[in-house]
Amino acid sequence: YFNSSLHHMSDLDAILIKRCAALKQDGYLFVNEYIGPNRFTFSDREKEVMQSVFHLIPEKYRVSHAEHDRGQIRKQVHYPDPAEVERVDPSEAIHSEEIVDSLKRHFKIEEFNYTGGTLMQFMLLDIAGNFKESDAESMQILQLIFDIEDTLVASGGLLPHFAMIIARP
């Protein structure tokens, strides 16, 4: 079982070869993982979609809860700087976009389920606390974001960044 750990591995093939050898022939490998761009190096298209959807959120739900800008209305999505990601944690998302291909080389994928977060991971960073179940409007906005993301991923307009995968040797 890999739970948000494979994206930290520098030698995916070596790790997966060992796991494949360790599993019984009728065994299963379960993976819950970030499979998006290495070190969060988003494409211009991904950034454009995130920013466009972000601007659909009314200002009252874009109030930051982050310490450095608490109470201020966010005007744009704050994307991580890949160089800073590498500096802070050299293993963070080092080969994340290669996980699925590496799994396919060593396992038979039985199930692949996109789990959301392609747009929302950074789009809702520090503002997610503004969305409360007791606020029907905020729930409608969240549902709209879920629907846009799900539709774009299902149609191939965006690649999934998170997935649950079941594989066999």
Show which residues each predicted segment covers.
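Short conserved AdoMet
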Residues: 10, 24, 104, 108
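Conserved class I S-adenosyl-L-methionine
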Residues: 28-71
